[in-house]
Amino acid sequence: MYGYISGEIKGIEPSYVIIDNNGIGYLIYVPNPYGFMIGKNYTIYTYTKVAEDEYSLYGFKTKEEKELFLKLISVKGL
C-alpha cells in the first residue's frame, strides 16, 4: 500500500489523474480531477483498494480528506 505519491500531473480525465513518479505513470481516482493542473507537481495521499480482480488507487489532496474517506468506508452497510 502507498501512503502517498508525489510527482508531475501528466493527464486529467473525468474521474482520475495520471501522475508521473520516476518515469511511472500512476492512474489515481480522485474526487475532483479538475482541481489539478497538468505540468504541476503534487503530493497525492492514496488509498489502495485490492479486490479479487482489481487493484485501484484512490487519491486525495490532503491527509484530512483521506482520513474522512477511511472513516466513511469503515461504516458497515456502505
Language-model-detected regions and their locations in the chain:
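Long, highly charged, low-complexity intrinsically disordered interaction regions
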Residues: 2, 10-78
